[in-house]
Amino acid sequence: NEIIIENASLKEFLMDLIKNLGRGEVSTVSAITKRIYQVYRYLTNFNFPGKSRKNIEHHYDIGGARGEKLYDIFLDTKHRLYSCAYWKEGTKTLEEAQQNKIDHIVKKLDIKEGQKILEVGCGWGGMAFEIAKQKKCEVTGISLSKNQIKYCQEKAKQLGLDNQVKFELIDYREAKGHYDRIYSVGMFEHVGKKFYNIFFKSINNLLKDDGLFLLHT
C-alpha cells in the first residue's frame, strides 16, 4: 500500500493528476494511478467481519470517554440516536424529532407485547430502550463498537431494563436465535454492496416465518 515517487515531488505528482481531470485523453501516469486506485478499492472493499470491526472502531470508538463527548455535542440528549430524525410539522427540537422517528418505526413494525426483537446496529441503545418500555418486550441490540456496547449495558442497568434489554458485541453474521421483529436503522451503509445478499440472508435466517423486518437506510 505504498507509492514511491522518484525524481519528483508529491506536489508535482498531484498537479499532473489535476491537469488531466476532465480531458478526453489522459496521461500514462494518470491512467496508471486510476487503475491502481481501482484495484486497491476492489481489494479493500471486501467487508468481512474483521474489516467491519476495524471500520466501526475507527468511526465510533474514538478517544474513549473523550470520543463520547464528541457525540454528545450533536446527538439528541434523550435517546442519543445517530441516524436522521423525523421533523414532522410542529416539531421544535431534535429530541422531539428523534422521538417521532422511534414512534413511526414502532408503528410500522406492529410490535406486540412479549415479542422478541433484534436491532442490527443498536448505536447507543436509545431505540431499543424505548421499544422495551413502550411494548414490554425482549430486545437484543448488536453492534461492533465497544464504546457503544459498554454504554448500552451501563445505561440498561441505570434504567432498570437489564433484564429486558441485552446488548452484544457481535457482527450481524454471528447473531443467533429467532426473532418476531428485526429492524436496522442507519447501519446498512456499512454493509458494502458485495455483502448485500449475505446481509439479507442473515436477516432471513434470524427472522421467524411470520416475522417482520424493517430496514431504514
Predicted feature residues:
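Conserved SAM-binding loop of SAM-dependent methyltransferases across substrates and taxa
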Residues: W124-K136
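A short acidic, Gly/Pro-enriched loop at the edge of an enzyme's catalytic core
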Residues: R173-I182
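A short glycine-rich, Lys/Arg-flanked "PGG" loop and its adjoining helix->strand segment in the class I
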Residues: N197-D209
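Conserved SAM-binding loop
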Residues: C152-Q153
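Conserved beta-strand signature within the Rossmann-like core of class I S-adenosyl-L-methionine
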Residues: D210-T217
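Conserved class I S-adenosyl-L-methionine
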Residues: E113-G121
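Conserved Class I S-adenosyl-L-methionine-dependent methyltransferase catalytic core
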Residues: I4-K108, K112
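A conserved beta-strand element that flanks and buttresses the S-adenosyl-L-methionine
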Residues: Y183-F188
